[in-house]
Amino acid sequence: MALDKQAFYSQYAQVAIEQQKRYGIPASITLAQMGLESGFGTSTPARRSNNFFGVKVGSSWTGAYDYYSDDRPNEKFRRYNNVMESIEDHSKVLMKSRYSHCQNYSPTDYVSWANGIKAGGYATEPDYAS
């Protein structure tokens, strides 16, 4: 059963705060991306692969993956054993060099983080950071 938006955010707020303390990524960014990318837990990758952030397989990924259609048909998306693995991996993705400019932003500056993540190529939608 899908959660409403507020229940979804409430369920994952504490872990997002923990990720903020550990990595400096605003909890609001983690929650917003998680909700947006997973359709608040209803997307097929979220339900079947515990992939709540739409993270695709890259050259360094050695874990399991599943095929889903996104920008193109049958793209490889990372598969996780549980939602916590997905959240942790999302934080690690945002610590990679393509998003290193974001690490200069305060955890309270969610606007700069959102724009920086978009500029780093996280999503293809023109208004992703809005």
Regions of interest found by a model, annotated:
Residues 1-130:
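Catalytic cores of secreted/periplasmic lytic hydrolases that degrade extracellular macromolecules
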